[in-house]
Amino acid sequence: MAYQHGITVLEQATSLTAPIEGDSAIQVVFGTAPINLAEDPYSATNVPIIAYSYAEAVKQLGFSYDFKKYTLCQSIYASFQLYAVAPVIFVNVLDPKKHKKQNAASTVPVENMQATVQVDGILADTVSVKKDTESGTALKVNTDYVTEFDSNGHLVITLTATGAGKDAKSLSVTSTSIDPTAVTAADVVGGYNASTGAETGMELVRQIYPKFG
């Protein structure tokens, strides 16, 4: 029989607490979310979204610890991270086509072929990137650079090795951001548009049971 001498370490995978799934009194939460970080920012407004896990909610709505600006994130954190309660139905009323603001051009230094834009709420599809200065060479997304968001929700621009910006020392970046401060109480309350048949805000509560049963 073999004996071990000295200090040994045993590592075990962190166990995950299974969420408590309810079939009655399910939360329906109305508010704002950082949908610029969502998988599809333009399909996450005034539509009931059901989530059974933190990952699922973040994928569909994005996430930020700035709970004052993004009120749905407080419920995402409390329900899935603190108390493991699922499912939760979310309705985001922040509309990226309506609640937005234009950001001034900013010069961002490049380090190791990457530049991080320290601006909140950027909609990735609105970004315009030029090499070095505002009058410099315009770069093409997915050809000269690719984008992603870091853990702080800031846009990271990565230059490609064969792109036109590969030797850039800085980038001039313009963009549009979502603006949660533009959301009003009227947006949350919502209503019914008789001409289009569209429902918004809390009026959508009528769709919850027919949609999710």
Task: Mark where each language-model region is.
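Surface-exposed assembly/interface segments
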Residues: M1-G213
